[in-house]
Regions:
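Noncatalytic alpha-helical scaffold of FAD-dependent oxidoreductases
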Residues: 1-311
Length: 311
């Protein structure tokens, strides 16, 4: 006879969305390096905020542990359970666009939408959602919110928290808090959304978010340089920031180990620098107008960094 709790869960989300076999659960219980092999009684795949609410209400009543999961791209094991009594709630089916407003420069999506899907929606409408990171093809916006992801554009656009206008959250007892505001100039009451962003599911499960989007730049200049040390890289960053009014929208320092992993796993990728280094810098300027003088101006500043031996 089927366990009573499993039967109740199936009544909420449907039998096919309750994964019980080891084969079905496996991809949710391991990350790509196989460093955090987990255990779970079942993986649950709700499709709506209401279903998440009913699940958490049930687990709250039964005092059953649960872990929310986005794209399972985290590298510290926070998205995986380690007890065969616990449950994982995967939000992968909650991947719908709720609203897109080009005039207000906002987008509202369910938490299971892939980051790259948000990029595509914005790109099709000549807009930009600036959060960008290596796992964007498989990570979800819910995971980005739960971890307050930074990405390569963090110095200019800020962390995920800075890009968030509002949230919809389900608390541990099943209560739904709708904070899906799109008003940018909002000084009413406590900023509860800021508590949930970065809380990694400990305060509740984020089910939807309203986000800031931006006009898409007309031109981009992307550079890869080598540096002898992180200090030299930071000296170069300060020099760039002081000597140009053109937005420096990305600046990422990478060690040679990280670059070697990319080169080993992506065979067509080539390092466009002849001499290997211990440190590399990936940086990008964005402009809202195409201008030959812009390219020349930035090139002069980069060459100045070479002369000063920052890069």
């Amino acid at each position: 006879m089927k366990n009573n709790i499993i039967k109740k869960i199936e009544d909420i989300i449907g039998k096919k969305n309750v994964l019980l076999s080891s084969e079905d659960k496996n991809k949710y219980l391991t990350e790509w390096r196989n460093r955090y092999p987990g255990k779970a009684r079942a993986v649950l795949r709700p499709k709506s905020t209401k279903e998440v609410s009913l699940l958490l209400k049930l687990f709250h009543q039964k005092n059953i542990p649960v872990t929310p999961q986005g794209g399972n791209t985290g590298l510290v094991g926070g998205q995986i359970t380690y007890s065969s009594k616990d449950f994982i709630i995967s939000l992968e089916r909650m991947n719908k666009l709720i609203n897109f407003n080009k005039v207000d420069e906002t987008i509202i999506v369910q938490a299971g939408m892939l980051l790259t899907q948000i990029h595509n929606i914005c790109d099709e409408n000549d807009m930009l959602f600036p959060l960008s990171l290596a796992s964007e093809g498989s990570c979800t916006i819910g995971g980005n919110l739960a971890t307050n992801a930074g990405g390569v554009g963090v110095l200019y656009y800020g962390n995920t928290r800075d890009l968030t206008l509002g949230l919809e959250v389900v608390l541990s007892d099943g209560s739904i808090i709708n904070l899906l505001k799109t008003l940018k100039k909002d000084n009413t009451g406590y900023s509860l959304k800021d508590l949930f962003v970065g809380s990694e599911g400990t305060l509740g499960i984020i089910t939807a978010a309203s986000l800031k989007i931006f006009q898409k730049p007309k031109d981009k200049l992307t550079f890869l340089a080598s540096a002898s040390s992180p200090k030299k890289a930071l000296d170069f960053l300060r020099m760039l920031q002081k000597n140009t009014s053109i937005p420096l929208t990305s600046f990422e320092i990478m060690n040679n180990h990280s670059v070697d992993i990319v080169l080993r796993n992506f065979g067509e990728t080539k390092l466009p620098i002849s001499k290997k280094s211990n440190w590399y810098i990936l940086f990008e300027f964005s402009s809202y107008e195409k201008n030959k003088n812009t390219t020349e101006s930035i090139s002069e500043i980069v060459n100045l960094g070479i002369e000063k031996k920052f890069i």
